[in-house]
Amino acid sequence: MSVKGITPQELAAYGIHNVSEIVYNPSYDLLFEEETKPTLEGYERGTLTTTGAIAVDTGIFTGRSPKDKYIVRDAITQDTVWWADQGKGKNDNKPLSQEIWNHLKGLVTEQLSGKRLFVVDTFCGANADTRLQVRFITEVAWQAHFVKNMFIRPSDEELARFEPDFIVMNGAKCTNPQWKEQGLNSENFVAFNLTERMQLIGGTWYGGEMKKGMFSMMNYLLPLKGIASMHCSANVGEKSDVAIFFGLSGTGKTTLSTDPKRKLIGDDEHGWDDDGVFNFEGGCYAKTIKLSEEAEPDIYHAIKRDALLENVVVLADGTVDFNDGSKTENTRVSYPIYHIDNIVKPVSKAGHATKVIFLTADAFGVLPPVSRLTANQTQYHFLSGFTAKLAGTERGVTEPTPTFSACFGAAFLSLHPTQYAEVLVKRMQAVGAQAYLVNTGWNGTGKRISIKDTRAIIDAILNGEIDKAETFTLPIFDLAVPMALPGVNPDILDPRDTYADKAQWQEKAEDLAKRFATNFDKYTDTPAGAALVSAGPKI
């Protein structure tokens, strides 16, 4: 049969044959019916909750499977991809031969052939000049729902002229029994082919593989065109001033970029081109563990009809226990971005960023709550992507655990990290943007820097007060730290002042500096990385 938008002949070109029916770009109402059919079993089945949202389970895969990620190594990718088996840096870009790719593609197309399929055409990227037109093909209704939530939904006029740049075939029900002979990690796979412009998924039901798969591809394609591709949140003020927030989990990225005085551009993935900053996505993928209306009202109220909950515990009466992490701590909800009130409309993009904020939660008690970065320090700290967590031990002693993630998103980088740093700084320098390192972590008192002080710091950055402040240079890290800021406790700005004995800060600072240097060594395999060593801490 032929359905508006795509024909069985087009699917046959991908290797999918004898399709019984094509459900093309289904409406939310149709998806609701499909997901709640009483005949569905296993992970295909959706459960209606009292919030109005559907809840689904993804089985043993409650997060991404980075060890099962592969990219075909060929003439296009050989000298461009940041490969896992080359250079000093560790990453997830494991090479795959064309022969094994063909085998995996055969498994997925065989799984999808003869089935009733959902085909969803979407955009990745809010800027029409640089967006990817992505076609998702799946046999599972809620997976179609997920991508409808997460990607940008084309208008009917745009669908009429839609020509896919990239195909994602999700064969979650199939696995690869020959994985051992082929030298792969397991029977599951998430594989990419830049020449064929295609992603294959097998064995894992986790929705985030589709979202982050396309992020990895944007991270390949855009920087090669001189466009920054960023794992960050972004917002815009009343004077059209744009700020972007980088930070790993637990640093306050979502909380601090959600500001009643500013409109949200997006919460996770953005590009920065000649026109300005733009969202890659048309939705949000928020963590829900321990979610409460008081702490996260925007997310809480976004969980309603058309939202899709993943791996939450649903009680017999349909209520959701957000505090129950028995399935996973990584419980999630996806929803279209318009479920949030204070957003940029109608297109999730704005002008050039003037403020770039790197968030870190330093559990070592060394870094100041805020500092201004030079251009080289901007690249150094962007490549370092540092945060740290406090981990309790059996005797109640707490030892900080450092985390370094290149560009605050190493898992999704397809090119060498220095390429992202270079493009970001070029974009910043072209418009005179300034970067700041903001520490939302701990200091010498053993207490975390208060959210009140951190919000006042962010306000001082956004309204320009910080640029008028006198600064001093913090030794070892060579950071320019303001001496006073409106609304900020002056006793915390110099981290040394939070210690009864300043020698204690010195000792911890030297230890952390060594960790920075050890981590940064992996970027010195390129001239660009080697040139930045001097912008790091001095041991």
From Swiss-Prot:
Monomer. It is an enzyme of class 4 (lyase). Binds 1 Mn(2+) ion per subunit. One of its GO terms (biological process) is gluconeogenesis. Pfam families: PEPCK_ATP (PF01293). Its cofactor is Mn(2+). It catalyses: oxaloacetate + ATP = phosphoenolpyruvate + ADP + CO2. Mn(2+) binds at K212, H231, D268. Its EC number is 4.1.1.49. ATP binds at residues 212, 231, 247-255, 296, 332, 448-449, 454. The keyword Metal-binding applies. One of its GO terms (molecular function) is metal ion binding. Involved in the gluconeogenesis. Catalyzes the conversion of oxaloacetate (OAA) to phosphoenolpyruvate (PEP) through direct phosphoryl transfer between the nucleoside triphosphate and OAA. InterPro entries: PEP_carboxykinase_ATP, PEP_carboxykinase_C, PEP_carboxykinase_N, PEPCK_ATP_CS. It comes from Yersinia pestis bv. Antiqua (strain Angola). One of its GO terms (cellular component) is cytosol. This is Phosphoenolpyruvate carboxykinase (ATP). Belongs to the phosphoenolpyruvate carboxykinase (ATP) family. Keywords: ATP-binding, Cytoplasm, Decarboxylase, Gluconeogenesis, Lyase, Manganese, Metal-binding, Nucleotide-binding. HAMAP family: PEPCK_ATP (MF_00453). Substrate binds at R64, Y206, K212, R332. It is found in: Cytoplasm. Pathway: Carbohydrate biosynthesis; gluconeogenesis.
